[in-house]
């Protein structure tokens, strides 16, 4: 009989040596969480939503789980369709045993353990009991959204918000003052950059209405974006974010960018080069604006999105049909950063790559632009999306350590739509401590507990606290 004699999620889960155990339990375990990039709906925090069942909090927006369910043959009715919540949960429970090796298996059981005290492995055999137990617990006041945030020891949450958003939810959260965490918006102007998209012109109307600007020229667009960024800053925003397949950079002038913008405004087809000129001009404007505002600029690079056209048409975009791109961006990235650096207008920046073959491109690029008296000014962001795995996080840490300064890394973020995903910070911290422990046990790092403990504390919490200019 195969048995370890202990629960799957136990106190030393993922900690494979004594150094790792000491570092995690002494230095990382109890630190607060700064979740500086996520996709949780701020309205649910403002309303202090109470979930009726675990499907609502687990399955209603999680494309990671949806992909796994499709892979084992679950019908779409029970994924994004009109199947009822319990049916969807039972189908997920049937799927879970097949996810071993995928972080979904670890995340699922870590969340069941931390929030519901459940040690049983989720499967079709345990599904009914786990459904009932979680449903009962989710009805308790401490399992409201704000209750979960408090229990998770979250101090800061940065949501992801369109420039046209009026941020009423953030204002309500701040006004009521009941949420333990400070909740700030983050500025994501992606819709203003895709000039070739059919949605571009309608979006300009939405943005213009929010900014009270008639957007009829490139300058009026930039005016609208600046007005909205200023408003976001007044609401506590200190980060921007851009999701781009690759980072465009071509030589361009205002006249060329204006010409491309006018073609888009007239719904004429842009050439790829015209769109790149427009995007380069707008991105440089925004980066300089972020620097003026004291923000951190984030680039999430390398997602090839919405590839299954039949399914996207059926269930909508961003529903689990994305994968890694392999577009090269080393030269354009360096040219973009250099264009800002040469006039001393480069803001603090975090670079993420979805494709890990570009890890060392980013890890070496950030070293080109450090300085300004800011420790770790340009960051290689944590393993993202398909790299949000044990191997992916270890590779990101190792590549950063090999080519830069791991000790200045600002650490983990959930990038999640679920309020149970704060356990991913625990998962990350365990992997961090284990990786450092391996280096120590092999004699590659000195067994200096005081210094190692400081490094673990800094990466887990304090580097982010110092790096981001959150309101006091």
UniProtKB/Swiss-Prot annotation:
Enumerate the InterPro entries for this protein: Metal_Hydrolase (IPR032466), Uronate_isomerase (IPR003766)
At the top of the EC hierarchy, this enzyme's class is: isomerase
Q: In which pathway does it act?
A: Carbohydrate metabolism; pentose and glucuronate interconversion
What GO biological process, any one, is recorded here? D-glucuronate catabolic process
Q: Which reaction does it catalyse?
A: D-glucuronate = D-fructuronate; aldehydo-D-galacturonate = keto-D-tagaturonate
One GO term in the molecular function aspect is:
glucuronate isomerase activity
Task: State if Isomerase is listed as a keyword.
Answer: yes
Top-level lineage group: Bacteria
HAMAP family, sorted? UxaC
Q: Which family does it belong to?
A: Belongs to the metallo-dependent hydrolases superfamily. Uronate isomerase family.
This protein is called: Uronate isomerase
Origin organism of this chain? Shouchella clausii (strain KSM-K16)
């Amino acid at each position: 009989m195969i048995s370890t004699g202990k629960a799957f999620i136990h106190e030393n889960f993922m900690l494979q040596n004594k150094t790792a155990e000491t570092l995690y339990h002494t230095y990382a375990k109890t630190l607060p969480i700064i979740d500086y990039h996520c996709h949780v709906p701020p309205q649910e925090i403002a309303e202090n939503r109470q979930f009726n069942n675990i499907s609502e909090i687990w399955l209603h927006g999680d494309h990671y789980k949806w992909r796994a369910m499709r892979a084992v043959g679950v019908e779409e009715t029970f994924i994004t369709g009109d199947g009822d919540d319990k049916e969807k949960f039972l189908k997920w429970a049937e799927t879970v045993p097949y996810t071993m090796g995928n972080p979904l298996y670890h995340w699922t059981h870590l969340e069941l353990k931390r929030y519901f005290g459940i040690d049983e492995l989720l499967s079709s055999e345990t599904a009914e009991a786990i459904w009932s137990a979680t449903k009962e617990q989710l009805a308790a006041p401490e399992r409201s959204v704000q209750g979960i945030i408090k229990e998770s020891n979250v101090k800061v949450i940065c949501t992801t918000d369109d420039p046209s958003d009026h941020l009423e939810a953030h204002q309500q959260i701040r006004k009521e003052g009941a949420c333990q965490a400070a909740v700030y918006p983050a500025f994501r102007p992606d819709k203003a950059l895709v000039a070739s998209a059919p949605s571009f012109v309608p979006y300009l109307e939405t943005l213009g209405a929010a900014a009270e600007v008639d957007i009829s020229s490139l300058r009026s667009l930039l005016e609208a974006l600046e007005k909205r960024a200023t408003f976001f800053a007044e609401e506590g925003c200190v980060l921007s974010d851009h999701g781009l397949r690759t980072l465009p950079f071509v030589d361009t002038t205002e006249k060329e960018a204006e010409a491309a913008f006018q073609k888009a405004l007239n719904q004429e087809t842009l050439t790829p080069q015209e769109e790149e000129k427009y995007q380069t001009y707008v991105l440089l404007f925004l980066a300089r604006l972020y620097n003026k505002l004291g923000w951190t600029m984030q680039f999430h690079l390398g997602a090839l999105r919405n590839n299954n056209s039949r399914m996207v048409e059926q269930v909508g975009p961003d529903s689990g049909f994305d994968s890694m791109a392999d577009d090269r961006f080393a030269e354009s990235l360096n040219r973009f950063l250099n264009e800002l650096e040469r006039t001393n207008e480069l803001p603090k920046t975090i670079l993420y790559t979805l494709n890990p073959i570009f890890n060392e491109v980013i890890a070496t690029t950030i070293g080109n632009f450090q300085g300004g008296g800011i420790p770790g000014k340009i960051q290689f962001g944590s393993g993202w999306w398909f790299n949000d795995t044990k191997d992916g996080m270890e590779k990101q840490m190792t590549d950063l350590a090999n080519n830069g300064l791991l000790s200045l890394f600002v650490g983990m973020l959930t990038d999640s739509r679920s309020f149970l995903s704060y356990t991913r910070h625990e998962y990350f911290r365990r992997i961090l401590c284990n990786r450092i422990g391996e280096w120590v046990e092999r004699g590659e790092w000195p067994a200096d507990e005081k210094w190692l403990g400081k490094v673990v504390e800094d990466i887990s919490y304090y580097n982010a606290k110092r790096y981001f200019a959150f309101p006091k």
